[in-house]
Design a protein with these regions (language model features):
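Conserved acidic/glycine
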Residues: 1-72, 174, 202, 208, ...
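Cofactor-binding active-site loop characterized by glycine-rich and histidine/acidic residues
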Residues: 29, 33, 45, 62-189, ...
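Conserved active-site and cofactor/substrate-binding residues in soluble primary-metabolism enzymes
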Residues: 35, 39, 61-68, 98-101, ...
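Short coil/turn connectors at secondary-structure junctions
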Residues: 86-90, 99, 113-116, 134-139, ...
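General beta-strand structural signal in soluble alpha/beta enzymes
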Residues: 93-94, 168, 196, 231, ...
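Thiamine diphosphate
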Residues: 123-290, 354-445, 567-568, ...
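Phosphate/diphosphate-binding glycine-rich loops and adjacent basic-rich segments that engage nucleotide
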Residues: 436-527
Length: 645
């Protein structure tokens, strides 16, 4: 726990009451708001950049942007608290959960969270995860994090509290989600007192909406749904206050579309897509040089790095990011095609995450087949499936694994239409996921919901989660030309290469992947049992197996990279073993282990069985998320010992 003093004097925040029936600020009110605005932006720049300097990443620009709205809202809350005529629910709802720095700042200002706690933003087990989680962080009043989910939710809150006005911070990115369109229609139809404060900064992760989605306008879209819409400069305090007063004193839903550059006034960042992520230390230092805050500069320069993941027995020092490899391997495949054939038969759909899912490499190499689809996962998946409607064509789709849950119905309809889709869902599991629970990709096997067709043909959906970079490369190359829907999962974290017992790589550079075949990473003796694993859990399981074998326990390890097909030969081998433990980073209720035991029983298994998986909400931080779930080598070894008695 740091003993440093927080370098921004949050105690100097000036609490004022703002009466929305008086739409003009006094000089005193304006000065107080300007002071509070600068104070809050200073705080957000510091503790987010400090976390970034420590290696915890995060998001700075969104919470930085919406501070003018925030300080005015707190004035409305204070007036309502003092008995003002207009009841305002004192919650700053936010549909962009990555702007969680706003909620932590509020918790500190309201005395729910010690100010020094902000030094530990996104750190392991410090209760300040990368998205707000109700009941986990003191002072945080709601959970948010998946775009497009909050407005529909607070429509219901508004119905439950018809005597209150609700305010929600929105964004031009989140408003691209289809559920916001549904929420708009419901709010208008029922005249709900929901007021939207939309940060329209023309920036999302992968680009500028004006460039990649010409014709899209937040204001015109909301007007089309029937909302009253006010467009203005979000950095003009007086005008913003007047517009917010008009919104709060009118009946029914209102949207204030507040135009501004991303991160206005922020060195190196203003107006750029880099503002979505954590502010770089260099930018924050320049900012505090302008502010004359040497203490903040010194703290950022000397921020202690979080400790890195240990190396485990049986795996290499060298690591690679499979999520990035996906795009690189796809470029290699596409380069071998004739240009006309490539453009005619392949289309790649991005959901504003091209840099994170690896497909930016495809965008750069073959822009003619790349679709910058914005933040519209459901529609983009269906478009990819529609492109793959013809037998000789296929759509390629990529987003985070957490958002697979949003696409289940589209996946089902694609299956009914016999579509060809190669879907890469990165950030699977929980490893390195400081963004925490709402971004966990743990229900990925929901994708495997097909049944036999009318003609008796088996469902050809395939689900792959290779646990080694060389195997991942071979998998993508092998399954590219297969028919049907193929789901390839990767982790956020970099993972090492698996090693043979002699120290050489288990999978060579020319390895040929065979769908449905399990690999025996370590064989057990005639009386030995097995651990079955995949993904980023696999090399941790290997570490556990190596430790157990060193201490006289006869145990082997199986890599099950194809998750929804049984390898009969391997299953017979496992069915004859005295014990089997499945260790995985998917949901313990919906993952491989929940069904694997039944398949063993069908083959005559009489041994002991157990499975490990994600069984509780996250703890923040990076690689320690796995140990928190009992999925590090120590946890897996302990479970093996408990299983054998």
């Amino acid at each position: 726990m740091t003993t440093a003093t927080f370098p921004v004097d949050l105690a100097s925040y000036k609490t004022i009451a703002l009466d929305p029936s008086v739409p003009t600020l006094t000089d005193e009110q304006r000065d107080a708001l300007a002071h509070n605005l600068q104070l809050c932006r200073d705080a957000i720049v510091f503790f987010t950049a400090y976390a970034g300097a420590r290696g915890l990443s995060g998001h700075s620009g969104g919470p930085y942007d919406t501070v003018p709205e925030l300080v005015i809202l707190r004035g409305f809350f204070e007036h309502s608290k003092q008995g003002g005529a207009t009841k305002v629910m004192p919650i700053v709802w936010d549909e962009a959960g990555h702007r969680v720095a706003t909620q932590y700042l509020l918790a500190a200002l309201e005395g729910e969270l010690p100010i020094e706690k902000l030094f530990h933003y996104r750190e392991y087990n410090e209760h300040l995860p990368g998205h707000p989680e109700r009941g986990y962080t003191p002072g945080v009043k709601f959970s948010s994090g998946r775009l497009g989910h909050m407005w529909p939710y607070i429509n219901g809150v508004a119905m439950a509290h018809p005597d209150h006005v609700l305010f929600m911070l929105g964004s031009d990115g989140s408003q691209q989600e289809g559920t916001d369109a549904e929420a708009a229609r419901l709010a208008v139809a029922h005249k709900l007192n929901v007021k939207l404060l939309i940060d329209d900064n023309n920036v999302t992760i992968a680009g500028h909406p004006d460039d990649y989605m010409p014709g899209y306008s937040v204001a015109k879209t909301l007007e089309g749904h029937g909302l009253d819409v006010s467009v203005g400069n979000g950095e003009d305090l007086d005008a913003l206050y007047t517009r917010m007063c008009a919104a709060i004193t009118s009946d029914g839903p209102v949207a204030l579309v507040n135009k501004r550059l991303m991160a206005p006034g922020m060195p190196e960042i203003e107006g750029s897509t880099h503002g979505h992520d954590v502010f770089k230390a260099s930018a924050a230092i320049k900012y505090f040089e302008q502010r004359g805050n040497q203490q903040a500069i010194d703290l950022i320069n000397n921020a202690p790095k979080v400790d890195s993941r240990p190396q485990y027995p049986g795996s290499s020092d060298e690591t690679d990011a499979n999520r990035s490899l996906f795009g690189k391997v796809m470029v290699e495949i596409l380069q071998e095609m004739e240009p006309e054939e490539r453009e005619r038969t392949v289309r790649v759909f991005d959901c504003d995450l091209e840099g994170s899912t690896g497909i930016k490499a495809i965008h750069e190499a073959f822009p003619e087949i790349f679709v910058a689809g914005g933040i519209m996962e459901r529609g983009n998946y269906s478009a990819a499936a529609g492109f793959g409607f013809d037998e000789d064509k296929q759509g390629v789709f990529a987003t985070f694994s957490a958002f697979l849950e949003m696409c289940i119905s589209e996946i089902t309809m694609a299956r009914f239409n016999r579509s060809n889709v190669l879907a890469h869902f990165s950030h699977a599991g929980v490893d390195d996921m400081a963004d925490n629970t709402c971004h966990f990709g743990i229900n990925n096997l929901f994708a495997d919901g097909g049944v036999a067709g009318h003609d008796g043909s088996p469902d050809n959906t395939r689900v792959y989660f290779p646990g080694d970079p060389a195997q991942f490369r071979a998998c993508v190359k092998r399954v590219f030309t297969d028919k049907g829907q193929r789901f390839v999962f990767s982790n956020r974290s970099k993972i090492p290469y698996l090693l043979k017992e002699d120290g050489s790589r288990f999978y060579s550079d020319d390895h040929r992947f065979e769908p449905g075949k399990d690999d025996l990473i370590r064989d057990a003796g005639p009386s030995g049992g097995y651990v079955v694993s995949y993904g980023a859990t696999l090399y941790r399981a290997l570490g556990a197996v190596e430790s157990l074998r060193k201490n006289g326990v006869d145990v082997g390890l199986v890599n099950k990279a194809t998750l929804n097909v049984e390898d009969d030969a391997m299953m017979q081998k496992l069915a004859a073993a005295p014990f089997v433990l499945v260790a995985e980073e998917f949901n313990i209720k919906t993952g491989l282990g929940a069904r694997f035991g039944s398949q063993l029983l069908k083959r005559g298994f009489t041994g002991r069985y157990n499975h490990l998986g994600v069984h509780k909400e996250g703890c923040g931080g990076l690689w320690r998320q796995m140990g928190f779930q009992g999925l590090d080598p120590e946890g897996i070894e302990k479970s093996v010992r408990e299983l054998i008695g």
